[in-house]
């Protein structure tokens, strides 16, 4: 065969860890030396970060529908670079989905949600002049956050699903993931909020590369 497809995934994906980057680069280099005309790699490893934005731009172009959504939400947030973002990746912690990882008991969920909301309150104290775009994979968390009616918090509408566990959904639902990525990319700083039981998602980091946003992590 002229084509070699491979999937290389890792749960160790800390952008600040030099040795993780070094080992990932060595593994990918070994695969890319295989004697095939085309090598198709699906991976969440760190690679070609400097070229990521330009390569992404070559492969993907937003449709008019997506561009209209981006323009609308940018206007609500004051324009590109005039807001920050905070991303939470709960998986099934709050009982929204069946995806893997632990699930908190019902009596543990609200205190945990409060802990996460407090991280947003503290972030606002540090940068009171900026709105905060909040994205998450839990409608329970987002609904609770919206009930607070915090004037500086912006949550985009749309059904929250886990793409890898969702089949035959509407176009609108799949569009939400693309919209989230582009909206994160236009923030001045992209924050991933995490602790030792949340999933250490690479999604916000990759989004930050698209338009040169600063990336940082907030530990609960």
Regions found by a protein language model. Name each.
Residues 115-116, 130, 155-156, 202, ...:
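Marks the mature luminal ectodomains of secretory-pathway proteins
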Residues 87-95, 118-170:
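Catalytic donor nucleotide-activated moiety binding site of glycosyltransferases and closely related
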Residues 175-220:
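A donor-sugar binding/catalytic signature common to diverse glycosyltransferases
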Residues 1-110, 114-117:
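Secretory-pathway glycan-assembly enzymes, especially type II membrane glycosyltransferases
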Residues 110, 155-193:
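Donor nucleotide-activated moiety binding/catalytic core segment of transferases
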Residues 83-84, 131, 189:
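Structural motif
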Residues 99, 145-147, 204-205:
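Short amphipathic alpha-helical segments
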Residues 78, 121-125, 146, 184, ...:
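N-terminal cationic-hydrophobic initiation segments that often serve targeting/anchoring roles
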């Amino acid at each position: 065969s002229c084509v070699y497809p491979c999937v290389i995934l890792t749960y160790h994906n800390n952008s600040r860890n030099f040795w993780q980057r070094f080992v990932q680069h060595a593994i990918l280099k070994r695969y890319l030396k295989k004697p095939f005309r085309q090598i198709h790699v699906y991976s969440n490893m760190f690679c070609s970060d400097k070229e990521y934005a330009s390569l992404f731009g070559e492969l993907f172009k937003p449709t008019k529908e997506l561009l209209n959504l981006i323009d609308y939400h940018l206007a609500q947030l004051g324009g590109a670079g005039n807001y920050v973002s905070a991303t939470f990746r709960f998986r099934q912690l709050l009982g929204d989905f069946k995806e893997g990882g632990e699930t908190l008991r019902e009596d543990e969920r609200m205190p945990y949600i409060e802990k996460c909301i407090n991280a947003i309150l503290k972030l606002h104290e540090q940068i009171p002049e900026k709105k905060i775009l909040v994205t998450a994979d839990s409608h329970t968390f987002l609904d609770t956050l919206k009930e607070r009616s915090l004037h500086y918090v912006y949550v985009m509408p749309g059904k929250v699903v886990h793409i890898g566990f969702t089949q035959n959904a509407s176009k609108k639902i799949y569009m939400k993931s693309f919209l989230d990525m582009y909206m994160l990319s236009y923030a001045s700083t992209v924050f991933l909020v995490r602790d030792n039981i949340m999933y250490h998602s690479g999604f916000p980091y990759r989004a930050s590369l698209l338009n040169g946003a600063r990336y940082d992590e907030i530990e609960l």
